Regions:
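Conserved N-terminal subdomain of the carbohydrate kinase-like
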Residues: 1-71
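A generic structural signal for well-ordered alpha-helical segments
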Residues: 5, 88-91, 122-123
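Hydrophobic beta-strand scaffold residues
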Residues: 12, 98-99
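Flexible, glycine/proline-enriched loop segments at strand-loop-helix junctions
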Residues: 42-43, 69-79, 104-109
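A generic structural signal for short hydrophobic patches within well-formed alpha-helices
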Residues: 56, 74, 105, 136-137
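Structural motif
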Residues: 66-68, 99, 130, 161
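Surface-exposed amphipathic alpha-helices with a cationic face
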Residues: 85-92, 153
């Protein structure tokens, strides 16, 4: 994985290896018709679920231009959730572009209410929000793309890209 990142011009200087906890994995179904693919995952108890505020506070964000966050780490553990918040807060404070893809994984959360609360709260820290249309229904309460985009604009997102499978994507810029 590290070599593939390097081969694609992605910096690996912030990668760490955990000698105790395993690497989580996710598999994703290949689909041709545009429906949401099945994506079984094995992440509970993984190294990522042990991510902590200490590691986030130790990061030098000085040369980072973009922080991309998904909704998976905050689902893994309370500790990883706190670390996710801290990363987004630090990035915003440092005026680093923050992108957020909710990546709903209900089976990883304690319950649906907690999932909605946390993911909608994390969207407050994002400059760009990238939900799927199904995620909009669950998180914003609508499949109307304009209304869903407005929901995220009200949280502060300058740009919302709503993914809609074979129908492409709906892009909305916040009007000043």
């Amino acid at each position: 994985i590290e070599q593939a990142l390097k081969d694609n011009g992605i910096g690996t200087n912030l990668l760490t290896y955990d000698p105790v906890y395993r690497t989580g994995i996710q598999l994703k179904e290949y689909v041709k018709d545009g429906h949401d693919p099945a994506a079984p995952y094995y992440r509970k108890g993984s190294a990522a679920s042990h991510l902590s505020i200490r590691e986030i506070d130790a990061l030098d964000l000085g040369e980072i231009g973009l922080v991309h966050v998904t909704g998976i780490p905050p689902a893994l553990s309370k500790e990883a959730r706190e670390a996710t918040y801290r990363l987004m807060e630090r990035a915003r404070k440092a005026q680093i572009l923050v992108t957020f893809d909710p990546n709903l994984r209900p089976a990883l959360w304690e319950n649906d209410e907690m999932m909605r609360k946390v993911l909608n709260d994390l969207a407050n820290y994002a400059d760009v929000v990238l939900p799927g249309i199904g995620e909009c229904e669950i998180l914003a309460g609508t499949t109307d793309k304009e209304k869903a985009a407005d929901f995220y604009h009200q949280k502060g997102a300058a740009l919302v890209v709503i993914k809609d499978g074979k129908n492409g994507a709906y892009v909305s810029e916040k009007k000043e």
